[in-house]
């Protein structure tokens, strides 16, 4: 899974599960702040990846990345979400709390952490 796809999933999962607008992320693996925003209303996600200048979103469980022209599934389950990135062919699981998203990328076989800035 691309690093920007992990960030997109983290922002979308947080918006879906916590119910607040995401105004940015800090990617611990990359060591940098990401310009990414996301919100969810009535099971519909809308987001913007400012670093790539592209939108993403869709009606759950399907999200579409306008930049990569690919679909990613996102299925909420309590305080976590799971899904599949069709571009990479890999699954993921995300654990979400008020200010943190931890995402396990099965393609990389490891965890990634994102601090969340709430709008």
Give, region by region, the residue ranges found by the protein language model.
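Repetitive, compositionally biased segments used for assembly/scaffolding
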Residues: 2-119
């Amino acid at each position: 899974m691309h690093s920007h796809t992990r960030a997109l999933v983290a922002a979308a999962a947080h918006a879906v599960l916590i119910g607040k607008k995401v105004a940015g992320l800090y990617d611990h693996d990359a060591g940098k702040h990401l310009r990414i925003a996301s919100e969810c209303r009535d099971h519909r996600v809308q987001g913007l990846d400012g670093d790539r200048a592209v939108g993403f979103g869709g009606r759950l469980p399907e999200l579409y990345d306008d930049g990569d022209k690919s679909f990613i599934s996102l299925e909420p389950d309590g305080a976590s979400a799971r899904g599949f990135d069709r571009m990479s062919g890999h699954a993921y699981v995300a654990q979400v709390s008020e200010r943190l998203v931890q995402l396990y990328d099965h393609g990389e076989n490891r965890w990634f952490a994102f601090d969340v800035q709430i709008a």
